[in-house]
């Protein structure tokens, strides 16, 4: 027997069920679940602001307020002697200051547990499959690509294919390109000198162009001109992001970003993709025809990908797709350029403020190289320069924190963390923690690295400007080698000091960099 119900009755039943389910869903999502999180975390000794029902109506209001505070702080000079964390990392800094290191804060309805214990930090970095990266907001999709966004087997595959491009023997072959770009920048600065051999210059845009030039030469080699074009497009895209943030648009309204900006970003993305597709297709065709590939990053990447496919019966499903290779090339540019340029600019700022360390570094450089070009063996002997770079990275790491998102219930040390929790590693706070580094933790003291990183950290995972463990930044040796050559070239040609016009306002959009540039007075040697 078949029972037939009037359509009106069915609709009433559906509406009744929905009216029962939806309120329960909302109550659980915006109140019961966060309160369960809070109770569980506090039972383990973690402290933080209590979750409030206002999150139901103002899910991003606190983040918007924090962003506003940071932007207000970034409009004023904080002075070189003061810690940058309170102004650029106010949410975490305020939470730790108020509740101590065993604390948490809220990102909407999600608790973010602050991890500062070196043993727990090591565990997070080691257990890469248990602690995947947090998914980024939609606006960040234009700047999240390649190996940094992948997890699990896909990450492992890409890491295996990309890794050969950054082997030390390959980096040695890139030294001439590094030196060529540095010499061009030095020549430009010499052209700005007045009759008395001095000039004042904002070095920040020059250093950005330097690292762009290096990436263009080392990543694309013979395709340098096309590489330069791609960088300019990426730069425009980054500019659109930064100017959007400067407009104080609340995080909760980013999805309403004006159509013209979104349209332009999509157009730039298409142009970048088409340009890289053209370069990659030409190189792949040459590789299939048996032609010798260029020994640049793209050439090495294509060779490695080709070898991976051949090892599995020429199955293209095993290696990277063209789109994935495009993403890796974009990553070369964005991360490679920004990481090294920020390291160089803060090194110049700090050496400009501490002339005694500048003099010691110059003496070492002249003893090793005199006025000759650099070589790999000599760069390996630069102990003082290396100490300085390590200390700059401690005080001014490229990124100021890492977030990880739990997808299942996990134990972390003595903590039991539920699925859905965020784990936050506040790099800048850990790098300047008095309990780890001593009372001078916030001071510029390169001598702390005189016996290397392991000795300075007492074997703990408390220093990780490039990350740590299996997912440590694949390009860290590239960045440090480039930085050594640039600083060496600079010290061979100039002495320098901070200009009275320099305004110390660090910002973190998109990386830890000077908001108003870096005015330096150069003196020709």
UniProtKB/Swiss-Prot annotation:
<dbReference type="GO" id="GO:0004497">
    <property type="term" value="F:monooxygenase activity"/>
</dbReference>
<keyword id="KW-0479">Metal-binding</keyword>
<dbReference type="InterPro" id="IPR036396">
    <property type="entry name" value="Cyt_P450_sf"/>
</dbReference>
<feature type="binding site" description="axial binding residue">
    <location>
        <position position="473"/>
    </location>
    <ligand>
        <name>heme</name>
    </ligand>
</feature>
<keyword id="KW-0752">Steroid biosynthesis</keyword>
<keyword id="KW-0560">Oxidoreductase</keyword>
<keyword id="KW-0472">Membrane</keyword>
<dbReference type="GO" id="GO:0020037">
    <property type="term" value="F:heme binding"/>
</dbReference>
<dbReference type="GO" id="GO:0005506">
    <property type="term" value="F:iron ion binding"/>
</dbReference>
<protein>
    <recommendedName>
        <fullName>Cytochrome P450 CYP72A613</fullName>
        <ecNumber>1.14.14.-</ecNumber>
    </recommendedName>
</protein>
<dbReference type="InterPro" id="IPR017972">
    <property type="entry name" value="Cyt_P450_CS"/>
</dbReference>
<comment type="similarity">
    <text>Belongs to the cytochrome P450 family.</text>
</comment>
<keyword id="KW-1133">Transmembrane helix</keyword>
<keyword id="KW-0812">Transmembrane</keyword>
<dbReference type="GO" id="GO:0016020">
    <property type="term" value="C:membrane"/>
</dbReference>
<keyword id="KW-0503">Monooxygenase</keyword>
<dbReference type="GO" id="GO:0016135">
    <property type="term" value="P:saponin biosynthetic process"/>
</dbReference>
<keyword id="KW-0349">Heme</keyword>
<comment type="pathway">
    <text>Steroid metabolism; cholesterol metabolism.</text>
</comment>
<dbReference type="InterPro" id="IPR002401">
    <property type="entry name" value="Cyt_P450_E_grp-I"/>
</dbReference>
<keyword id="KW-0408">Iron</keyword>
<dbReference type="GO" id="GO:0006694">
    <property type="term" value="P:steroid biosynthetic process"/>
</dbReference>
<dbReference type="GO" id="GO:0016705">
    <property type="term" value="F:oxidoreductase activity, acting on paired donors, with incorporation or reduction of molecular oxygen"/>
</dbReference>
<keyword id="KW-0753">Steroid metabolism</keyword>
<comment type="function">
    <text>Involved in the biosynthesis of spiroketal steroid and saponin natural products from cholesterol such as diosgenin and analogs (e.g. furostanol and spirostanol), plant defense compounds used as main precursors for the industrial production of steroid hormones. During the 5,6-spiroketalization of cholesterol, may catalyze the 27-monohydroxylation of furostanol-type steroid to an intermediate product that undergoes a stereospecific formation of the terminal heterocycle to yield diosgenin.</text>
</comment>
<dbReference type="InterPro" id="IPR050665">
    <property type="entry name" value="Cytochrome_P450_Monooxygen"/>
</dbReference>
<keyword id="KW-0443">Lipid metabolism</keyword>
<keyword id="KW-0153">Cholesterol metabolism</keyword>
<dbReference type="Pfam" id="PF00067">
    <property type="entry name" value="p450"/>
</dbReference>
<dbReference type="GO" id="GO:0008203">
    <property type="term" value="P:cholesterol metabolic process"/>
</dbReference>
<keyword id="KW-1207">Sterol metabolism</keyword>
<keyword id="KW-0444">Lipid biosynthesis</keyword>
<feature type="transmembrane region" description="Helical">
    <location>
        <begin position="2"/>
        <end position="22"/>
    </location>
</feature>
<dbReference type="InterPro" id="IPR001128">
    <property type="entry name" value="Cyt_P450"/>
</dbReference>
């Amino acid at each position: 027997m078949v029972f037939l119900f009037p359509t009106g009755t069915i609709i009433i039943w559906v509406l009744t069920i929905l009216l029962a389910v939806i309120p329960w869903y909302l109550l659980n999502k915006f109140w019961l679940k966060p309160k369960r999180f809070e109770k569980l975390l506090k039972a383990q000794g973690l402290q933080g602001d209590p979750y409030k029902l206002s999150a139901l109506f103002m899910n991003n209001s606190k983040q918007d307020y924090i962003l506003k505070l940071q932007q207000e702080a970034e409009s004023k000079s904080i002075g070189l002697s003061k810690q940058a964390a309170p102004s650029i990392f106010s949410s975490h800094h305020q939470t730790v200051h108020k509740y101590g290191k065993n604390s948490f804060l809220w990102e909407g309805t999600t608790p973010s547990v602050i991890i500062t214990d070196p043993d727990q930090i090591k565990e997070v970095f080691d257990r890469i499959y248990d602690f995947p990266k947090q998914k980024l907001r939609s606006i960040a999709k234009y700047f999240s690509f390649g190996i940094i966004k992948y997890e699990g087997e896909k990450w492992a595959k890409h890491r295996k294919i990309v890794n050969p491009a950054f082997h030390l023997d390959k980096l040695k072959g890139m030294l001439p390109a590094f030196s060529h770009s540095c010499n061009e920048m030095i020549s430009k600065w010499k052209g700005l000198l007045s009759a008395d051999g001095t000039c004042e210059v904002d070095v920040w845009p020059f250093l950005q162009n330097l690292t762009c030039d290096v990436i263009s030469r080392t990543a694309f080699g013979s395709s340098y001109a096309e590489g330069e074009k791609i960088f300019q497009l990426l730069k425009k895209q980054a500019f659109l992001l930064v100017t959007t943030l400067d407009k104080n648009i609340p995080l909760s309204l980013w999805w309403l970003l004006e159509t013209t900006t979104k349209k332009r970003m999509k157009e730039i993305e298409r142009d970048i993709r088409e340009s890289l597709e053209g370069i990659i297709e030409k190189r792949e065709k040459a590789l299939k025809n048996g032609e010798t590939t260029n020994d640049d990053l793209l050439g090495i990447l294509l060779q490695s990908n080709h070898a991976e496919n051949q090892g599995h019966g020429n199955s293209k499903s095993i290696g990277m797709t063209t789109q994935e290779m495009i993403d890796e090339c974009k990553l070369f540019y964005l991360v490679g350029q920004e990481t090294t340029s920020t390291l160089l600019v803060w090194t110049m700022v700090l050496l400009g403020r501490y002339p005694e360390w500048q003099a010691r570094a110059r003496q070492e450089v002249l003893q090793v190289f005199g006025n000759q070009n650099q070589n790999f063996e000599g760069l390996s002997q630069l102990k003082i320069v290396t100490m300085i770079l390590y200390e700059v990275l401690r005080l001014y790491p490229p990124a100021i924190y890492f977030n990880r998102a739990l997808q299942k219930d996990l134990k972390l040390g003595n903590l039991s963390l539920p699925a859905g929790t965020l784990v936050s590693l506040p790099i800048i706070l850990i790098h300047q923690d008095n309990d780890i580094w001593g009372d001078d933790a916030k001071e510029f003291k390169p001598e702390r690295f005189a016996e290397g990183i392991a000795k300075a950290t007492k074997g703990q995972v408390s220093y990780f400007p490039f990350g740590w463990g299996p997912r440590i930044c694949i390009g860290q040796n590239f960045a440090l080698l480039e930085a050594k050559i640039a600083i060496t070239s600079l010290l061979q040609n100039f002495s320098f000091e901070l200009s009275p016009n320099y305004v110390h306002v660090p910002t973190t959009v998109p990386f830890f960099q000077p908001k108003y540039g870096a005015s330096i007075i150069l003196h020709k040697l």
